[in-house]
Structure formats: C-alpha cells, structure tokens
Amino acid sequence: MLVVVLIAVASSLATFALRDPSSTQLENEAARLASLLEAARAQSRATGIAVRWEPRPVSPDTEGFRFVGLTPGNELPRRWLGEGVSAEIIGQPALMLGPEPIIGRQRLVLRLNDQRLTLATDGLSPFAVAAEETPQ
C-alpha cells in the first residue's frame, strides 16, 4: 500500500514539473533573437553601417522580422522558429543596432499565445531576457 502511495505522489509531482510547450518555444525564440540582434550589432560595428531590426505583422505573406542595413552576403534569418510569434518594440518603430558601440536603452516584447517575454539592453550590454516593467 505504501508503495502505491509513493508512486502516486511521484507521478503527481512529475505532472506538475512538466513545462508549457509554448513557454519553452518562446524562450527558444527569445534566445535566438538575442543572438541574432548581437550578430547584427557586431556586423554594424565592423562595417560602420547603421543596422536596424524591424518586426513584421503576423501574416502568411510576410516574414517575421527583418534586418535593414546589412551588407549583401551577410543576411541573417528573417523568420521565427515557430508559428504565432510576434514582437513589439517599446517606444519606437525599430531597434537601432549600431554602428556606435553604445546604442541606447531598448526593449521589445515577444508574444506567443498568452505568453510574453521581454528582451532588453541598456545600450552597452547585450540583449537579454529582462523583467517586465510595471507602470508607475
């Protein structure tokens, strides 16, 4: 009887430990986008050409986002890994990625269903997942 109870408790704990797949997908999208933004930032500094990142509307006809200003042959991916991901830049239409070493404070919110993640930089540090800002 004790063994049955232990198995029931262990399986209920395992059920609680399972993660939401959309949350994992959004975390993967955020990590990938942060890497792409830093790659574009490095290319911008290396070439001395201003590069910006713009999200695109969610539609079967458009790509998920685009990098404007990259030199030919140095293009980066323009699609999300999965369907339904969208991005919104806070306070401006595009992220400015250089060529200056300090680019200014910038934030964007990634969304997938009811999940949200914020990527941000203080202008000197790389883009990374950040805590949500609460209005005061």
Language-model-derived ranges and their functions:
Residues 1, 9-42, 46, 50, ...:
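N-terminal helix-rich module
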